[in-house]
A protein has these predicted regions:
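Non-heme Fe(II)/2-oxoglutarate
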Residues: 1-88, 93-95
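Catalytic core of non-heme Fe(II) oxygenases with the double-stranded beta-helix
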Residues: 70-212
Length: 212
């Protein structure tokens, strides 16, 4: 899917007071090692700590930005539910390699969480909770094909030709405290290794019916 806008950003959208309030609420939750697809722990792909939180006031704070980005970026994706929010903490040498947030199939029809059944992640949100002066590294980066490729003729391309068409984008503004970045969940992104200090963020996914 070729997009006009691969992400939408709201710089310093959330006040410092609310950022610290979110951190305080999240630190009360149990912390575990972050996992990758299918809940497998793969330290070569991801090394960080996470906890989970579901607070109505956090959704009420963030959802208006999701609706605005969805409209202004011309995605207009159907979605009707938020997953649990994930509080993520990276310290020195921790990272999250290239990945997408969208699985290759919907949540199971018999998922114990009724609101997840038969749905996929449509939009991803990351809220920056740490002042950029408190850490080094931990950059937020995207990558995508710079031009649309005819998938029917993919086999004609060498790996080098594909690599030449991949664009990597460093989102410098994403480091600002209180900044929200929203993007389609199928877009590739990563967090580069932390070299000093600690980076904290809140991540959430808006889910809906699979694309047709």
């Amino acid at each position: 899917m070729q997009l006009k806008n691969n992400y939408w950003i709201f710089t310093k959208a959330i006040s410092k007071t609310n950022c610290y309030k979110i951190i305080k609420a999240c630190l009360k939750q149990s912390k575990i090692k972050g996992t990758v697809a299918n809940s497998k722990l793969k330290l070569r792909a991801r090394n960080c700590y996470v906890s989970w939180i579901s607070e109505d006031w956090i959704y009420n704070l963030l959802n208006p930005f999701i609706h605005t980005a969805n409209r202004n970026a011309n995605w207009n994706f159907q979605w009707d539910w938020n997953e649990l929010s994930q509080f993520t903490e990276y310290t020195k040498n921790q990272f999250y390699e290239w990945h997408t947030d969208q699985d290759n199939k919907p949540y199971a029809a018999d998922n114990k969480m009724i609101n997840l059944r038969n749905k996929i992640r449509k939009l991803s949100l990351t809220l920056q909770l740490t002042d950029p002066a408190e850490y080094d590294g931990g950059d937020f980066e995207f990558k995508w094909f710079d031009v649309e490729i005819d998938l029917a003729s993919e086999f004609q391309y060498s790996k080098q030709k594909f690599d030449d068409k991949i664009k990597t984008v460093l989102v410098k503004e994403a480091k600002e405290l209180g900044t929200i970045i929203i993007f389609p969940s199928f877009v590739w992104h990563r967090i580069t290794p932390i070299t000093k200090g600690k980076r904290q963020s809140l991540v959430n996914w808006s889910i809906g019916k699979p694309f047709i």
